[in-house]
């Protein structure tokens, strides 16, 4: 299988606060990127899965969308 760059966008609620997030992951499939999102936000911000709302998951092509990647070191995986 081939590794792909996925972008996960959404928002999370913690108490009365609501914050938006955009995470970039290298994963084999879309479901893995969603799982990593829950894992990272849960451990770093102490959020439950029900507090995290994923709005959009899409794949970036590292060759075409080089300017959209937040860190050029992601290209080292391809």
Curated annotation (Swiss-Prot):
The keyword rRNA-binding applies. GO terms for molecular function: large ribosomal subunit rRNA binding; structural constituent of ribosome. One of its GO terms (cellular component) is ribosome. Pfam families: Ribosomal_L18A (PF01775). InterPro entries: Ribosomal_eL20, Ribosomal_eL20_dom. HAMAP family: Ribosomal_eL20 (MF_00273). This is Large ribosomal subunit protein eL20. It comes from Nanoarchaeum equitans (strain Kin4-M).
